[in-house]
């Protein structure tokens, strides 16, 4: 099976990706792992990517797309198929992926889209607090500190504050929605309700993927 998984930050995409890989034995292609491997193996695109990263520059799309293409021709993909996680991030990358898959004779079979109301994600993502003395991490709702603590004993990182989280989600929605629309027009998108127990989310994914096998 050849799949994409999509979802906003905090939607549980990483957790579900791991479960899909374990159950369906597909190769997990995550952007970070792919870049690290390409640079470590000094592939043509890996060397190019490193030259940008070393200068502190953003890696251009054509290099990112090239790294993905290099990964897609490897033996484990031919044997098992893949789950792409964290790519494409823009509609331009989605078009490049379509072209690369067509060049390689690979068919994309499904896009798993984990959906959660963004306002609930703000609560999930902005609840993290850190104890000033110990550095221990808690969550205001899901893992509150127990014991003789005061509010002033904790601090919150700037990018965990609600306004920062909202801005981050807005950027992700603006970039991600055109990609989902693009694949929905091809009949590939399977929407999964993400605001439920982790096992129930996977149950829904499992039902979809079992039909695609």
Curated annotation (Swiss-Prot):
The lineage of its organism: Bacteria, Bacillati, Bacillota, Bacilli, Lactobacillales. PANTHER family: NUCLEOTIDE KINASE. Belongs to the adenylate kinase family. This is Adenylate kinase. The keyword Ubl conjugation does not apply. Keywords: ATP-binding, Cytoplasm, Kinase, Nucleotide biosynthesis, Nucleotide-binding, Transferase. Its main location: cytoplasm. The keyword rRNA-binding does not apply. It is found in: Cytoplasm. It comes from Streptococcus suis (strain 05ZYH33). The gene is adk. CDD domains: ADK. GO terms for cellular component: cytoplasm. Monomer. Residues 30-59 are annotated as: NMP. One of its GO terms (biological process) is AMP salvage. GO terms for molecular function: adenylate kinase activity; ATP binding.
């Amino acid at each position: 099976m050849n799949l994409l998984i999509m979802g906003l930050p905090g939607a549980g995409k990483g957790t579900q990706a791991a479960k899909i890989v374990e159950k369906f034995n597909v190769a997990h292609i995550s952007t970070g792992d792919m870049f690290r491997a390409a640079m470590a193996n000094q592939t043509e695109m890996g060397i190019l990517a490193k030259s940008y990263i070393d200068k502190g520059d953003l890696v251009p799309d054509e290099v990112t797309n090239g790294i993905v293409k290099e990964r897609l021709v490897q033996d484990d993909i031919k044997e098992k198929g893949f789950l792409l996680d964290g790519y494409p991030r823009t509609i331009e990358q989605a078009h490049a992926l379509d072209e690369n898959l067509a060049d390689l004779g690979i068919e994309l079979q499904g896009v798993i889209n984990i959906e959660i109301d963004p306002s609930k994600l703000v609560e999930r993502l902005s609840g993290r607090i850190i104890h000033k003395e110990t550095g221990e991490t808690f969550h205001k709702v899901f893992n509150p500190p127990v014991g003789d603590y005061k509010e002033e004993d904790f601090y919150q990182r700037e990018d965990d504050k609600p306004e920062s989280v909202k801005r981050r989600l807005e950027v992700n929605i603006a970039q991600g929605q055109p990609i989902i629309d693009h694949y929905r027009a091809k009949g590939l998108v399977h929407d999964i309700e993400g605001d439920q127990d982790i096992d129930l989310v996977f149950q829904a994914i499992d039902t979809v993927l079992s039909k695609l096998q």
